[in-house]
Amino acid sequence: MSKRESSKYKIDRRMGENIWGRPKSPVNRREYGPGQHGQRRKGKLSDFGVQLRAKQKLKGYYGDLREKQFRAIFAEADRRKGDTSENLIGLLESRLDAIVYRAKFVPTVFAARQFVNHGHVSVNGVRVNIGSYRCKAGDVIEVREKSKQLVIVLEAVSLAERDVPDYIEVDHNKMVATFGRVPTLSDVPFPVVMEPHLVVEFYSR
């Protein structure tokens, strides 16, 4: 298991949930957190603890985003009109690395960020190597020609453990995806319950 894979599963163990729905997640085999004290019984969380956990889970799901980066995304969601929690999900799902992951071009969101950073993806015909790049409805995301036969791509496309959501149209033969619309919380196929309203409460304290 690579260092990055180990780090990813550490998030699962910390949360006590298989947040990406992966068959190899260690929480499928045990119900305690990482480290030598992981088997200690956990007490009931305070309201703050519940809010913090919701934030850490959402932040971890999108590739264990840095706090400064995640807080900036929240700040923009809060500035926009409408429901802040829905805005937050919409902004996170509009990230290029999230769309590459949702389109099943790669197996994990961590791999998606690295894949984008290494220049394997174009948006509307222009190479983009920034995972946090924000896509708009109608944008066309394509795996670059030289990258379409990479093993990581071919294996990801064949994975049956997750489906492409209906707000993204994908042609896996051409390795092209169209970001149809910005989704709402109910549209997003999270394997576990995400509670962005608790994230709003956390940052609104």
Curated annotation (Swiss-Prot):
- Return the annotated region ranges for Disordered: 1-46
Show where the S4 RNA-binding domain sits: 94-157
Q: Name one GO molecular function term.
A: rRNA binding
Example GO biological process: translation
List the GO cellular component terms.
small ribosomal subunit
Where in the sequence does UniProt note compositional bias of the Basic and acidic residues kind?
Answer: 1-16
One Pfam match, given by its short name, reads: S4
Q: Which UniProt keywords apply?
A: Ribonucleoprotein, Ribosomal protein, RNA-binding, rRNA-binding
Per UniProt, subunit arrangement is: Part of the 30S ribosomal subunit. Contacts protein S5. The interaction surface between S4 and S5 is involved in control of translational fidelity.
Q: What's the stated role of this polypeptide? A: One of the primary rRNA binding proteins, it binds directly to 16S rRNA where it nucleates assembly of the body of the 30S subunit.
What family does this belong to?
Answer: Belongs to the universal ribosomal protein uS4 family.
Q: What is this protein called?
A: Small ribosomal subunit protein uS4
